Amino acid sequence: MTMLKDPSKKYRAFPTIDLPDRTWPSKTITQAPIWCSSDLRDGNQSLIEPMDSEKKLRFWKTLVQVGVKEIEASFPSASQTDFDFVRTLIEDGHIPDDTTIQVLTQAREDLIARTFESLRGAKKAIVHLYNATSPSFRRIVFNQDKQGVKDIAVNAAKLFVKYAAQQPETQWTFQYSPETFSATEMEFAKEVCDAVIEVWNPTPEHKIILNLPATVEVSTPNIYADQIEWFCRNVSRRDSVIISLHCHNDRGTGIAATELGLMAGADRAEGCLFGNGERTGNVDLVTLALNLYTQGIDPLLDFSDIDGVRKVVEECNQLPVHPRHPYVGDLVHTAFSGSHQDAIRKGFAKQQDGELWEVPYLPIDPADIGRSYEAVIRVNSQSGKGGITYLLEQEYGISLPRRMQIEFSQVVQGETDRLGLEMTAQQIYSLLHKEYLQANAPYALVSHRLQEENGHSAVEVEVAGEGETTLHWRGKGNGALEALVAGLPIAVEIMDYNEHAIGAGTNAKAAAYIELRVAGGRPVHGVGIDENITTASFKALFSALNRSLSQQEAKAA
């Protein structure tokens, strides 16, 4: 079978919502929603190999550490393992006073009774009831009409009241999800939810949660936002209801749908860390939170050690986080492109502590989430001088002059083309060392003696020449470098000179860079590094001289 030429014969567009006076497009998110993690329930049930109790407890502790205050821990009536995990959390004191455990149940009395039993002794708990309400589920799965589906929800809601009354020591919060809400007729979704509200009788002081899932994402996120705004306007007792979102990512827009849903009036968001969950996953709470953070809004979740959180999630879920995953992927703060690297390097150079973050191509400061700058710029065949320069500056304190950046980038480019691989900072430094600092033929500086007389410098250098010969060159000039040039047996024009310190204190070294031209040839650079600045400048001159002579010899051959 192949894709249809006319997909309209098999698929139909989702209907839009008639809401001409919608207000959500002109609104912005100004505060974090109530967060609820479903990693241990929705996320866990979607794993090839569900977590054992040890992994679940490790994951629970990570969620608590991050700051998630409502955590859906399990489906206690589904298995003894899930039931026992809830008991472990309660009996062993793993639920902090500011954290609420949430559990899920279907709308059957035996399952509801078992669910409440699992929570015995909890200080506070959210019990989550659901049943599907969309036309396809009513017709295909349950063979029920609207009244039948509504009755299921109402009867189960009454059982919640009954069993909660038997455990008055617990502070109960009831939650209802019209599963497949986003594919349900809005009037009917409201009708069912209103009926549940009447049974539970919430107040502004003791609210219930209505969770409105995009169980399967079926439309563009603007339609979901319209549904949420319509529902918030029309549901009864809105001041006594927390509107919660539960988006999946079937169309790849779970983040956008959730954010637009919050703009449309929702108060709460359920999801999983890094987007685990059924099929294409639940909405990613980490991305949602850091999207807020990068807009200057406190997300009320702490991802200062995002790689530590990722390690726990990957080991517990036994699923890798994609290298391009927002904020946490291995490559999301990495630039290979030369123009990107140059912009980032310049951005870092201008960025000051305490100022608004404005580094190009980096929407967040990697340091805020525990990332180093080491991987921000990496060098391959697509890279330019900016990335190479940045790595040498950051890792080795070497600041190449601009024209030398261009020259050395061509050397690196040739090496990456030859290897077909990325180059690390260490490999780039090794290439710099080989190309410039080891350029000691045909002339190698052995020693030098410098004298100052009447404001002039006199230099004598001992040089190892070809064939194990020893040469002595002498020169005078206004400075040490000019004196050395005067003593060379070859006509040399110094075109540029730069120097800087590497490090500080007694261990500091000097780096010198010379651009010169030999006998009318093309400009060539040299580098010298030494504890003594004069020696460093002499080494740089010999480096450039030898490179120029070697290039002329190679060209002549």
From Swiss-Prot:
Cellular component terms (Gene Ontology): cytoplasm
Biological process annotations from GO: L-leucine biosynthetic process
Catalysed reactions listed for this entry: 3-methyl-2-oxobutanoate + acetyl-CoA + H2O = (2S)-2-isopropylmalate + CoA + H(+)
Domain annotation Pyruvate carboxyltransferase: ranges: 33-307
SUPFAM superfamilies tied to this protein: 2-isopropylmalate synthase LeuA, allosteric (dimerisation) domain, Aldolase, post-HMGL domain-like
Chain positions recorded as Mg(2+) binding sites: D42, H246, H248, N282
PANTHER family attached to this UniProt entry: 2-ISOPROPYLMALATE SYNTHASE, PTHR46911
Family (UniProt): Belongs to the alpha-IPM synthase/homocitrate synthase family. LeuA type 2 subfamily.
Alphabetical UniProt keywords: Amino-acid biosynthesis, Branched-chain amino acid biosynthesis, Cytoplasm, Leucine biosynthesis, Magnesium, Metal-binding, Transferase
Catalytic activity, EC: 2.3.3.13
Natural source organism: Pseudomonas putida (strain ATCC 47054 / DSM 6125 / CFBP 8728 / NCIMB 11950 / KT2440)
Pathway, per record: Amino-acid biosynthesis; L-leucine biosynthesis; L-leucine from 3-methyl-2-oxobutanoate: step 1/4
Gene: leuA
Pfam families: HMGL-like (PF00682), IPMS_D2 (PF22615), LeuA_dimer (PF08502)
GO molecular function annotation: 2-isopropylmalate synthase activity; acetyl-CoA C-acetyltransferase activity; magnesium ion binding
General function of this protein: Catalyzes the condensation of the acetyl group of acetyl-CoA with 3-methyl-2-oxobutanoate (2-ketoisovalerate) to form 3-carboxy-3-hydroxy-4-methylpentanoate (2-isopropylmalate).
Keyword Coiled coil listed: no
Quaternary structure, from the entry: Homodimer.
EC top class, as a word: transferase
Spans annotated as Regulatory domain: 439-557
Cofactor(s), names only, from the UniProt record: Mg(2+)
Name of the protein this chain belongs to: 2-isopropylmalate synthase
HAMAP family xref list: LeuA_type2 (MF_00572)
Localisation per UniProt entry: Cytoplasm
